From Swiss-Prot:
<dbReference type="GO" id="GO:0006974">
    <property type="term" value="P:DNA damage response"/>
</dbReference>
<dbReference type="GO" id="GO:0016301">
    <property type="term" value="F:kinase activity"/>
</dbReference>
<dbReference type="GO" id="GO:2000042">
    <property type="term" value="P:negative regulation of double-strand break repair via homologous recombination"/>
</dbReference>
<dbReference type="GO" id="GO:1905337">
    <property type="term" value="P:positive regulation of aggrephagy"/>
</dbReference>
<dbReference type="GO" id="GO:0030307">
    <property type="term" value="P:positive regulation of cell growth"/>
</dbReference>
<keyword id="KW-0131">Cell cycle</keyword>
<dbReference type="GO" id="GO:0004674">
    <property type="term" value="F:protein serine/threonine kinase activity"/>
</dbReference>
<dbReference type="GO" id="GO:0008284">
    <property type="term" value="P:positive regulation of cell population proliferation"/>
</dbReference>
<keyword id="KW-0805">Transcription regulation</keyword>
<dbReference type="GO" id="GO:0032435">
    <property type="term" value="P:negative regulation of proteasomal ubiquitin-dependent protein catabolic process"/>
</dbReference>
<keyword id="KW-0539">Nucleus</keyword>
<dbReference type="InterPro" id="IPR011009">
    <property type="entry name" value="Kinase-like_dom_sf"/>
</dbReference>
<keyword id="KW-0723">Serine/threonine-protein kinase</keyword>
<dbReference type="GO" id="GO:0042802">
    <property type="term" value="F:identical protein binding"/>
</dbReference>
<dbReference type="GO" id="GO:0045732">
    <property type="term" value="P:positive regulation of protein catabolic process"/>
</dbReference>
<feature type="modified residue" description="Phosphoserine; by CDK1">
    <location>
        <position position="362"/>
    </location>
</feature>
<dbReference type="GO" id="GO:0097421">
    <property type="term" value="P:liver regeneration"/>
</dbReference>
Amino acid sequence: MSGPVPSRARVYTDVNTHRPREYWDYESHVVEWGNQDDYQLVRKLGRGKYSEVFEAINITNNEKVVVKILKPVKKKKIKREIKILENLRGGPNIITLADIVKDPVSRTPALVFEHVNNTDFKQLYQTLTDYDIRFYMYEILKALDYCHSMGIMHRDVKPHNVMIDHEHRKLRLIDWGLAEFYHPGQEYNVRVASRYFKGPELLVDYQMYDYSLDMWSLGCMLASMIFRKEPFFHGHDNYDQLVRIAKVLGTEDLYDYIDKYNIELDPRFNDILGRHSRKRWERFVHSENQHLVSPEALDFLDKLLRYDHQSRLTAREAMEHPYFYTVVKDQARMSSAGMAGGSTPVSSANMMSGISSVPTPSPLGPLAGSPVIAAANSLGIPVPAAAGAQQ
């Protein structure tokens, strides 16, 4: 065996090659720390693998913010997240990093973000119309095309990491803790993304992946929204996850994929993969979801959920798909009328301070997938008694 066949991204391949080293060399990044006394924690919003997330108040201007207190992980990983957030700041639909503070006692870093009045996705996704799905998918694509153009893969695209303020039709792509700089020919860790959204490349242990990983995850989100099946590929473990995919996309194309890249499949798959035909997308349509499905939706989905990462649409190609024609037309009309609401990043003043325009923001839904720590008061900030009570 000569090893796997190398692969390079079809777009934005050499972005980081043409940037100065300090752009992508996050290990050398010097973090500028803000003042932790500027923030008062209000209540806990959620916890994840790598962090705890709180709603807080910036007491210098009385604005709501979100504070993500990082668990003690490798300094390198924290620096990577910070550098990526700083590089992407101001980009369309990218969550804005407003400040970085550190508790002087515990030395635990905390990231301060603009506040988004989020609706929990499990409730929201059941209420979205066909147009809503197109609209929000297009908004995610703006964020993905931007980060890809900046040489960055998100690597954890999933509903929990998409904050939607439905009332204001505002969307933000959050949690850049697993994001990484793309360098052609580099082999990456396949232990990224959440199981239901892991691309086949991760499941077959192909390490030379690229931005197209995010497009698979987006395809999984689209399928779950239009078919009202959450998650769409429901594997019980990483091996079963590939089996669930093969039962839809078929085993023939899977074997073509592993042959093309000379991938050696884990012997554990021998007993569980079986032989499956490729299913037509129409078979997932029923009376409860047919109002969300159209020929262009199925065509778009088909062009995202491909085994071969090089065959998937890029974010920019996806934005040009007929599925988005109505959204593009509406946004063009609104921007010519000077009112392109949710389609553009909020003003930089608003970004730095959180969204002040919402008079009485309702509570953020739990950030269930967010990265987290045990010490509720690790910022050394007085926390109201109820702050840790609400999950």
